[in-house]
Amino acid sequence: MAPSFDTLSEQDLHEEEVEIDFSDLKAQYEVRLEEGLDAFVVIDGLPVVPEESKPKLIKFLLKKLNTVGRTREDAIFMPLNEKGMSEGFAFVEYDTPEQAIAATKHLHGTPLDKKHTLAVNKLTDIDRYGREGRVDEEYTPPKIEPFQEKEHLRSWLGDPNARDQFAMYRGDKVGVFWNMKNNPPENVVDRDHWTQLFVQWSPLGTYLASVHPQGVQLWGGPQFGKQKQFPHPFVSLMEFSPGEKYLTTWSSRPIQLDGPPGALSYEEEGKNIIIWDITTGKPLRSFVSHELAAPAGPDGDAAQAKKKVQWPAFKWSADEKFVARMLPGQSISIYELPRMNLLDRTSVKIEGVMDFEWSPATVQREGVKQSEQLLSFWTPEIGSNPAKVGLMSIPSKEVVRTRNLFNVSDVKLHWQSQGAYVCVKVDRHSKSKKSLATNLEIFRVREKGVPVEVVDSLKDTVINFAWEPKGNRFVLITTGEVPTGTAVPPKTAVSFFAPEKTKSGAAGNFKLVRTIEKKTSNGIYWSPKGRFVVVATVHSQQHFDIDFWDLDFEGEKPENEKDLSANLQLMKTNEHFGVTDIDWDPTGRYVVSSASAWTHSLENGYHIHTFSGTTLTEHAVEKFKQLVWRPRPPTLLSKEEQKKVRRNLREYSREFDEEDKYAVDIANTAIVEMRKRLLNEWTAWLKKEKEMVEEEREVLGLPKYEEEPAAKPTPGAEDDTIVEEIVEEIIEESEEIVA
């Protein structure tokens, strides 16, 4: 009879434990009793400090810890040793286990200062993996996945015919095509529902971005495979940095995290804007939107008017080392990249600031040796203080030039593409505030002291202004005052300006070349290579003219324009019904005019023109929405190599003409070959059918089918004359009186 529990001896108990080994069952079915330890993390790598410095260290550490979750000072335990010094680690309790996971994911390996780097682990992980036997003592080399070659993200640049690509969005489809000049475009890829809002190329053409309710997706390579994903719920706006290193996304809805953090952490919760690192695919920092002041409503009530979105919310310096945003009326915050820390830990306070713009290129000012980035800004009249335009050097934050302005209604800042000039377009009102006029204040940034030239010969308001890319000429459009309630669009004037020639070769003062009156134009579109400009009337219901201008015409120059650096010539005027957009290809050889269904639904599609205005093709596309050319990165040729190409351009032109002729011959040959193939197929089919008919006749016992011989012409038939007589017969005649 087995002994009862009460009669068991101490020895029996020990024998039972020794005889039966439960270790394998415990390892397989062990129940974790962590009792809330999932919300704890252990932070190692902290500085060793005395007891009196511990509260200060905890407060400093708390700022880091709260970027990924929520914790408190009393939830941080930092043990001390016998000497009253900290041990270099701490235990931290977060509000939820998800926040603890986010801390290990985002804070592990981040620097606390120059000498200390944080190591963050979950307390349960330390307990789980720190036990004896949980980690193999023998090293097992990791399995290395076989190398997989990635797609060449700039493969389109190697096209043997140097063709350009464009993306076209129509209906629910997005396609990428090769431009084939006057032939139908050649499709590269075409996909349904590729985007929900729009598509956009990155500035150097490496990526094609699509926008979805879940976020932004980047595509690239010969077959446009997925490259990067940037989750941002309900994103509606995006912008790349100039060198494609960073991406900004914006949504009107603040981010809400429903489940455990993924790519987005608790730091992004409640924010509208995220700045991403494209290489890593991770967010650098997130922000809440600053809404611009709402325009006044019909009754002067600004509170009832719809608030305007400030976009781009962040503006990038040319070298991508800084990004800045404006708090309207108060300050400009400048952040250093890639750490996204505030420059000098403080924003630049500028009372009343209304707008700012970075120089699009790094500028070398005369007498300045250190590297700098420039930004321009303006403030309105405040009390008795005049309006002001300023030029600031970054990172020093030194204001290197200011200019006072009076009777100002509005200001627009226009940088030349190389940063050599910044044109300040000033709309001034009369003392009675009943009329407006515009004058231009042009800052010559590269010259000593940054002199300012004033162009005050304009009598009307400037509604559009554009610098020549990599040049020193500009075009503007002016209009007079429009009576209220008038449905007819106002007449405009197009003015071309160029600098005077000087003996030193430097650009002289800006002078008017010519003004074209009684136009309806409202858009200016320079060729990316300069010299040629398209001036068009877009988004109009009555006028659709597109003018192609050449500012370096090689013909005879008018006597009154001899001293100016321009020879203006209208090459051609076209019309495109319902035109809404004008886009140059990156080489400056072709121009696309398009009519988008986003604006109207009449005759949607696009036309392709040469730079001189010759229309190559016209494509009517149902539900056409968008056409965007793929940008090209800057050339790798040196300036000397580029000069050599220009010198030998005539020789290259002959080669290109021969290639074009050969391409046409190939196309014609292909047509002939196709027709020959069809004829041969028809002949073979006819022969086969005849053989089948003969076999059937033979089976049925019918005589062989003989084709009737062709009728032979009778002798003398060549001299015969055929006379035809047409006889008309009236069957019925009726007369009807029409009122």
Curated annotation (Swiss-Prot):
GO CC annotations, alphabetized: eukaryotic 43S preinitiation complex; eukaryotic 48S preinitiation complex; eukaryotic translation initiation factor 3 complex
Location of this chain's protein in the cell: Cytoplasm
Ranges of residues in domain RRM: 39-125
Swiss-Prot/TrEMBL keywords: Cytoplasm, Initiation factor, Protein biosynthesis, Repeat, RNA-binding, WD repeat
Gene Ontology annotations of biological process type: formation of cytoplasmic translation initiation complex
Cited SMART domains: RRM (SM00360)
GO molecular function, one term: translation initiation factor binding
Primary role: RNA-binding component of the eukaryotic translation initiation factor 3 (eIF-3) complex, which is involved in protein synthesis of a specialized repertoire of mRNAs and, together with other initiation factors, stimulates binding of mRNA and methionyl-tRNAi to the 40S ribosome. The eIF-3 complex specifically targets and initiates translation of a subset of mRNAs involved in cell proliferation.
Quaternary structure, from the entry: Component of the eukaryotic translation initiation factor 3 (eIF-3) complex.
Similarity annotation: Belongs to the eIF-3 subunit B family.
Protein name, entry field: Eukaryotic translation initiation factor 3 subunit B
